[in-house]
Amino acid sequence: MIRQRRRALTPEQQQEMGQQAATRMMTYPPVVMAHTVAVFLSFDGELDTQPLIEQLWRAGKRVYLPVLHPFSAGNLLFLNYHPQSELVMNRLKIHEPKLDVRDVLPLSRLDVLITPLVAFDEYGQRLGMGGGFYDRTLQNWQHYKTQPVGYAHDCQLVEKLPVEEWDIPLPAVVTPSKVWEW
């Protein structure tokens, strides 16, 4: 149902909301202070990350994208992403940078990790796509200096999500109209 809501947005609405959210994210203090920021390439009606990526580049931030780990199933690597990066389609039909070990940045060296989500609630819980990739990535985020933040449309807010023991709540979510912090 939430995916249908975001898919129902017109291209013009998507573009406008992507710009609004990017502007809001660029004023979020952890992003302002960051040197390295991991983000994702949006698909399936997700909040458009292209305006954010372009603003991050203009601000001199190093941008990283998630890549499915080739040897450790269910885990992510983060590779440097720049305008000349070669993208390939992964097994989930999502574009990611072509794997080059020289471009990998350890999670502990990421300042901010911007996460996709299907839905979030007023308590910071996020509902992902079901693969558990970000739950595994975020399970020990407090031990790193990495600051996670969700990135979503306003229409992805729900009253309360069911919580499983492996679910990792987010300390913040940025939408086109608001920064939610817990």
UniProtKB/Swiss-Prot annotation:
Record's GO cellular component terms: cytoplasm
Knockout consequences: Cells lacking this gene does not cause a growth defect in rich or minimal medium. However, when grown in minimal medium with added glycine, the mutant accumulates 5-CHO-THF. If the only nitrogen source in minimal medium is glycine, the mutant shows a severe growth defect, likely due to inhibition of serine hydroxymethyltransferase (SHMT) and the glycine cleavage system by the accumulated 5-CHO-THF. This phenotype can be complemented by the glutamate formiminotransferase (FT).
Reactions the enzyme catalyzes: (6S)-5-formyl-5,6,7,8-tetrahydrofolate + ATP = (6R)-5,10-methenyltetrahydrofolate + ADP + phosphate
Start and end residues of each stretch annotated as Disordered: 1-21
Pfam families xrefs: 5-FTHF_cyc-lig
Assigned protein family: Belongs to the 5-formyltetrahydrofolate cyclo-ligase family.
Function recorded in the entry: Involved in the removal of 5-formyltetrahydrofolate. In vitro, it is a potent inhibitor of various folate-dependent enzymes in the C1 metabolism network and in vivo it might function as a folate storage. 5-formyltetrahydrofolate is also used as an antifolate rescue agent in cancer chemotherapy. Catalyzes the irreversible ATP-dependent transformation of 5-formyltetrahydrofolate (5-CHO-THF) to form 5,10-methenyltetrahydrofolate (5,10-CH=THF). The reverse reaction is catalyzed by the serine hydroxymethyltransferase GlyA (SHMT).
Protein name according to UniProt: 5-formyltetrahydrofolate cyclo-ligase
Organism: Escherichia coli (strain K12)
Species classification: Bacteria, Pseudomonadati, Pseudomonadota, Gammaproteobacteria, Enterobacterales
Protein encoded by which gene: ygfA
